[in-house]
């Protein structure tokens, strides 16, 4: 909520910013309460101002959310294999701009992530593996696209139908529902591998950013180049949380680290690359303390400071650099280096 998060199904249902009706906060200047109406045109939106404050303006005590009908019987799963990343991105853009509705989960993996997914879900051991090779969907070039649709029966079916139509037009090979079901099965278990890997000094972490379609290829290329600058590093990327205007790019790296200082240096180079490439430094993970040094360079110097002075004049709420509000000048990164891509 206070990090402006987004769930895996946000392409259809929206992010937290789309489904909040009202909030209540306890702040140093008193209670802040917003009314819950479906929409208002009454000046600046206090709901949006408070969301993303990460505890620096006050403590969230209550929230009213929109709800949706849950109709799992209407879900339509899909998965396709594209020959390369560029073609897959073009198809994804067309799917999001064709005015045919959006799927609930919309996930496109780049070649490196596709390679790992096929092994992790044992697709390499099925008849699909030799068939892909025979048809020209080459390893470390091909890209996996998967997801599912939700909603009313006719709507869900029509969205899946149009995704199929566009995917085939861009030369994608239909895969079975096995791939999507395998992803769903391990969706919330795979991240726990992180703790086991750390016992062997192997670190895995994720960084994500919001990108316009016009800049998607460059951000993907530039950030991955920085990630791969560290020897023996696995870097996977997928596109998810998509919109007609762009999407979220999600970078995952796996590498061996000697200590926390090395991790911080590496992490910093990646965030520098994201900021300099013209992407938003966070789509849904928020800012916190780790991303805080880059925030002023992204939104400007005065905006958050003015709000902080009003809601928390003594700076008692969540101190220590959260969203960059009390950082020293020498701690700030990438000032005056933001690029805008329209």
Report each predicted region and the residues it spans.
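FAD-binding subdomain of flavoenzyme oxidoreductases
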Residues: 1-107, 334-342
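A short, flexible low-complexity segment enriched in Lys/Arg and Gly/Pro that occurs
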Residues: 21-40, 86, 221, 255-265, ...
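Short beta-alpha connecting loops at secondary-structure transitions
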Residues: 76-78, 204, 289-295
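C-terminal substrate-recognition/cap domain of FAD-linked oxidoreductases
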Residues: 89-269, 273, 277
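Activity-critical C-terminal alpha-helical subdomain
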Residues: 288-342
């Amino acid at each position: 909520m206070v990090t402006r998060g987004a769930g895996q199904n946000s392409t259809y249902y929206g992010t937290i910013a789309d489904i909040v009706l009202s909030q209540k906060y306890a702040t140093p200047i008193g209670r802040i309460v917003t009314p819950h109406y479906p929409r208002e045109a009454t000046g600046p939106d206090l709901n949006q101002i408070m969301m993303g404050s990460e505890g620096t303006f006050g403590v969230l005590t209550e929230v009213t959310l929109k709800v949706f009908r849950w109709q799992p019987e209407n879900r339509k799963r899909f998965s396709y294999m594209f020959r390369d990343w560029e073609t897959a991105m073009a198809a994804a853009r067309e799917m999001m701009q064709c005015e045919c509705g959006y799927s609930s989960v919309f996930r496109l993996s780049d070649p490196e992530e596709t390679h790992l997914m096929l092994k992790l879900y044992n697709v390499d051991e099925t008849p699909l593996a030799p068939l892909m090779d025979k048809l020209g969907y080459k390893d470390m070039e091909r890209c996996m696209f998967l997801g599912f649709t939700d909603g009313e029966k006719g709507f869900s079916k029509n969205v899946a139908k149009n995704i199929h139509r566009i995917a085939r037009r861009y030369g994608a090979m239909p895969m079975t529902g096995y791939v999507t079901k395998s992803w769903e099965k391990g969706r919330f278990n795979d991240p726990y591998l992180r703790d086991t890997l750390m016992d062997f000094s192997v670190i895995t972490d994720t960084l994500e950013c919001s990108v316009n379609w016009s800049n998607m290829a460059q951000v993907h290329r530039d950030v991955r180049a920085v990630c791969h600058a560290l020897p023996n590093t696995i870097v996977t990327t997928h596109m998810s949380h998509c919109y007609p205007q762009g999407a979220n790019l999600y970078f995952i790296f796996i590498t061996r680290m000697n200590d926390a200082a090395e991790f911080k240096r590496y992490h910093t180079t990646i965030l520098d690359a994201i900021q300099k490439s013209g992407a938003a430094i966070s789509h849904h993970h928020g800012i916190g303390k780790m991303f805080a040094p880059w925030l002023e360079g992204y939104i400007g110097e005065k905006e958050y400071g003015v709000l902080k002075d009003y809601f928390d004049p003594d700076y008692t709420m969540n101190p220590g650099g959260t969203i960059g509000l009390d950082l020293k000048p020498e701690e700030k990164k990438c000032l005056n280096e933001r690029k805008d891509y329209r």
